[in-house]
Amino acid sequence: MSKLGKFFKGGGSSKSRAAPSPQEALVRLRETEEMLGKKQEYLENRIQREIALAKKHGTQNKRAALQALKRKKRFEKQLTQIDGTLSTIEFQREALENSHTNTEVLRNMGFAAKAMKSVHENMDLNKIDDLMQEITEQQDIAQEISEAFSQRVGFGDDFDEDELMAELEELEQEELNKKMTNIRLPNVPSSSLPAQPNRKPGMSSTARRSRAASSQRAEEEDDDIKQLAAWAT
């Protein structure tokens, strides 16, 4: 059995040790990534230093230059191994994060499903149908009430419009006849007026003005009679 197998076998024999939580495992992986990142930086610096030493010795100290190049190769090999390890750890961390996220999502969905089930247990489909039917009926009643309020209320006073118009015309005619009766017409003389003497050249100005005023009054009375006759017809 390989040493790696013995290591995992020995580690798994401890039943008292509880499995780590996803949060703890993620913390450990991030710490490992940080440590390997620092190791990468150290190796890259050492590689640059060994290259500088190899260039410095060059052909003057060939043995020292070769030793520097050998160390550079070892550091590059370690750096390659660390790159592979970091890739594996990064993949493992992302997978664990996804698993943890999926677990939390599943737990929350299960919690919500239980809550929904608890709510639905208190619901009866028959009661819901009855409630919706009752709501519909109440809405119909409210609509009928609104329509009833919007209609014209006559309180049973259904009269014939033509009959009312005829009665109104009769009242207007009676009022018109009453006004005609109250109007006093000018008295018409029963006998013919005496003939007026012809004006002589010697008629005074006072007599002429009196005659003109009498003639004007007679014309005004004739106009009033004509207006009353036209209004009566």
Curated annotation (Swiss-Prot):
Region spans: Intramolecular interaction with C-terminus: 1-153
Tissue: Expressed in heart, spleen and kidney.
Compartments in which it is found: Cytoplasm, Cytosol; Late endosome membrane; Midbody, Midbody ring
Residue ranges the record marks as coiled coil: 125-183
Protein name as it appears in the record: Charged multivesicular body protein 4c
Phosphoserine, modified sites: S210
Alphabetical GO biological process terms: autophagosome maturation; autophagy; late endosome to lysosome transport; late endosome to vacuole transport via multivesicular body sorting pathway; macroautophagy; membrane fission; midbody abscission; mitotic cytokinesis checkpoint signaling
Domain notes: The acidic C-terminus and the basic N-terminus are thought to render the protein in a closed, soluble and inactive conformation through an autoinhibitory intramolecular interaction. The open and active conformation, which enables membrane binding and oligomerization, is achieved by interaction with other cellular binding partners, probably including other ESCRT components.
Chief subcellular location: cytoplasm
Biased composition (Low complexity): 204-216
Keyword vocabulary terms for this entry: Coiled coil, Cytoplasm, Endosome, Membrane, Phosphoprotein, Protein transport, Transport
Organism (species): Homo sapiens (Human)
Positions of disulphide bridges: none
GO MF term set: protein homodimerization activity
Main function: Probable core component of the endosomal sorting required for transport complex III (ESCRT-III) which is involved in multivesicular bodies (MVBs) formation and sorting of endosomal cargo proteins into MVBs. MVBs contain intraluminal vesicles (ILVs) that are generated by invagination and scission from the limiting membrane of the endosome and mostly are delivered to lysosomes enabling degradation of membrane proteins, such as stimulated growth factor receptors, lysosomal enzymes and lipids. The MVB pathway appears to require the sequential function of ESCRT-O, -I,-II and -III complexes.
Ranges where the record places region Disordered: 1-24, 173-233
Complexes and interactors: Probable core component of the endosomal sorting required for transport complex III (ESCRT-III). ESCRT-III components are thought to multimerize to form a flat lattice on the perimeter membrane of the endosome. Several assembly forms of ESCRT-III may exist that interact and act sequentially. Self-associates. Interacts with CHMP2A. Interacts with CHMP4A. Interacts with CHMP4B. Interacts with CHMP6. Interacts with VPS4A. Interacts with PDCD6IP; the interaction is direct.
Posttranslational mods: Phosphorylated at Ser-210 by AURKB during cytokinesis: together with ZFYVE19/ANCHR, phosphorylated CHMP4C retains abscission-competent VPS4 (VPS4A and/or VPS4B) at the midbody ring until abscission checkpoint signaling is terminated at late cytokinesis.
Pfam families: Snf7
